[in-house]
Amino acid sequence: MNNIIKMLNDEQMKTDVPDFGAGDTVVVQVRVKEGEKERLQAFEGLVIAKRNRGLHSAFTVRKISNGEGVERAFQTHSPLIASIEVKRRGRVRRAKLYYLRERSGKSARIREKLATK
């Protein structure tokens, strides 16, 4: 029984998910259905949390829109997500960046992770 569940989960998992973590800036292309039409909507922001649970993996992206903080949680392997693109790698020392909710301006900046040779 356990093997059947594992096989079904592996079958539904996406293989084109890039490697990213907390502190990275990502652009998530989300499929949005409006009436009969379906279009892609981009959501760009900072990953403040990532949850690795196989098929049930999720991540939370935060952005500032018109001076207001907006957070959106995505299921990593959801069919509504068309693509995830990593724009910038951030250097952080925490797995969850919830403390950024109280910060704004320069204090909410994240250092960039430089590529190692």
UniProtKB/Swiss-Prot annotation:
The keyword Membrane does not apply. GO terms for cellular component: cytosolic large ribosomal subunit. GO terms for biological process: translation. HAMAP family: Ribosomal_bL19. InterPro entries: Ribosomal_bL19 (IPR001857), Ribosomal_bL19_CS (IPR018257), Ribosomal_bL19_sf (IPR038657), Translation_prot_SH3-like_sf (IPR008991). This is Large ribosomal subunit protein bL19. GO terms for molecular function: structural constituent of ribosome. SUPFAM superfamilies: Translation proteins SH3-like domain (SSF50104). This protein is located at the 30S-50S ribosomal subunit interface and may play a role in the structure and function of the aminoacyl-tRNA binding site. Gene3D superfamilies: 2.30.30.790. Belongs to the bacterial ribosomal protein bL19 family. Keywords: Ribonucleoprotein, Ribosomal protein. It comes from the Bacteria. The keyword Ribonucleoprotein applies. Pfam families: Ribosomal_L19.
